[in-house]
């Protein structure tokens, strides 16, 4: 974009709207920007993310507000050394024109040595997030790539599904705050921290990832037994109790022991709060918060 004269941006800053934004460039920082795509101008709603990117290295997404997509609001995978922090990812368009029908999804998150912390995911049917492995081939079925650290995030008002996926990935899920809302389904999914998936190998068995999960809180209110149990015992009720029917007959105690880690995967240090403190910090500071607009203010209030 070549301008012929000086441009002054006043008040609330920059909002990019109308079409998807995709980053394939390395050594990039995006900070204090809004991405509110919508479905009025985008002519190809399938695969249209408000903000996404893959195949890059050394990328930071910081204090951005991302919403109103027709596929996922924010999907980042197949990146190396990636950080998404202090962002608000909200209100995917469930009926935005995707050819598969209802499609209000938060994002697919992955990458090698990727950190996702202090983000707010609000009002998505599913993929809050969906942890997704990149296309790189894994030797001998071992988990030798895609190390993801997911901590101090707030997940609010998921519909049918909160976090899931993670096939053959190495993931820390630490001190996150899950809060069911009006759209959240009843039953055990109200206590869902993470529904683990696996990859089927050629011999008919399954290849699992390695996960460290601790300190997560599910706040469903005083009368919600599912969320209370998941908070008290993250693994038993927030994870083991969340396997899909496809796996329930094949998940043995040996499987459970093999996927559960007693120590977290090593990552660069991130200032880590308790789940309760993270909830307050994220609501106070996440998103394009130097000048918080009416959309983000409403999401936070809700």
Annotate each predicted stretch with a short phrase.
Residues 10, 26-39, 55-68, 80-98, ...:
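Right-handed parallel beta-helix
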Residues 20, 50, 72-73, 95-96, ...:
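Structural detector of coil-to-beta-strand junctions
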Residues 2-3, 14-32, 37-57:
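Extracellular beta-strand-rich solenoid/capping regions of secreted or surface-exposed proteins
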Residues 39-44, 70, 138-139, 186-187, ...:
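Extracytoplasmic/secreted cell-surface and envelope-processing proteins
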Residues 2-3, 18, 178-302:
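Long, contiguous C-terminal flanking segments immediately downstream of a protein's structured core
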Residues 45-47, 71, 75-79, 99-102:
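Short, surface-exposed recognition loops or helix-turn segments adjacent to catalytic cores
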Residues 4-9:
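Short, small-residue-biased leader/transition segments that mark boundaries at the very start
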């Amino acid at each position: 974009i070549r301008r012929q004269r000086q441009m002054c941006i006043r008040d609330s800053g920059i909002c990019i709207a109308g079409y998807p934004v995709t980053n394939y460039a390395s050594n990039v920082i995006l900070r204090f920007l809004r991405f509110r795509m919508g479905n009025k101008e985008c002519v190809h709603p399938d695969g249209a993310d408000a903000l996404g990117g893959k195949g890059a290295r050394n990328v930071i997404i910081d204090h951005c507000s991302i919403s109103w997509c027709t596929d996922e609001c924010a999907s980042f995978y197949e990146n190396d050394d990636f950080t998404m922090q202090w962002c608000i990812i909200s209100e995917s368009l469930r009926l935005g024109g995707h050819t598969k029908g209802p499609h209000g999804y938060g994002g697919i998150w992955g990458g090698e040595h990727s950190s996702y912390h202090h983000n707010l995911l609000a009002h998505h049917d599913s993929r809050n997030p969906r942890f997704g492995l990149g296309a790189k081939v894994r030797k001998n079925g071992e988990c030798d790539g895609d190390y993801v650290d997911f901590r101090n995030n707030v997940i609010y008002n998921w519909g049918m599904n909160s976090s899931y996926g993670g096939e053959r990935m190495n993931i820390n899920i630490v001190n996150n705050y899950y809060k069911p809302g009006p759209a959240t389904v009843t039953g055990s999914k109200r206590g869902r921290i993470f529904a683990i998936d696996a990859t089927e190998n050629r011999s008919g068995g399954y290849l699992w990832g390695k996960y460290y999960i601790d300190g997560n809180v599910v706040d469903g209110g005083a009368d919600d037994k599912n969320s209370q149990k998941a908070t008290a015992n993250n693994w038993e009720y927030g994870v083991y109790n969340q396997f899909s029917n496809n796996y329930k007959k094949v998940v043995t105690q040996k499987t459970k022991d093999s996927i559960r880690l007693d120590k977290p995967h090593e990552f660069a240090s991130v200032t880590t709060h308790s789940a309760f403190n993270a909830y307050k910090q994220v609501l106070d500071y996440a998103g394009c918060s130097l000048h918080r607009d009416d959309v983000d203010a409403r999401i936070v209030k809700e």
